[in-house]
Amino acid sequence: MVNDESSLLYWCHKNNVPIFVPGITDGSFGSQVWMYWQEHRNLHMDLFQDEQDLMDMVFDAKESGAIMIGGGISKHHTIWWNQFRGGLDHAVYLTTAEEYDGSLSGARVREAVSWGKVKAAADYMTVEGDATITLPIIVSAVLERMDSE
């Protein structure tokens, strides 16, 4: 049960906002989930249903937008399904990755525009900086703006 009001998970649960973690079985977190599962076999994850749910949300949306924190699998997962609906309408990348090495993590929004993963007419921006600093500043500014409207 999620009952900590200072938790993002709490508020997502309370407001029926889904959270998708495409790489949940990857790395140290995945091994921790696996170890937990050894003693709690009633834990089930349906990654294919997650894919279906995410795809349904993307295709059913009148507009699609995303804040992508970091790069790699979570960023790619978000932009991937959106290319099949003509691209994201709104996109914000928060990244510390460099562009010069050709990695997906370092690719700027204009690269996703060139592939149709973000619409050319979309509102988009890349914010270069540590997300533990930039995300709270962005959230604070959005909340302040919402309060004034």
Spans of features found by a protein language model:
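Internal active-site segments that recognize and position negatively charged phosphoryl groups
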Residues: 1-58, 64
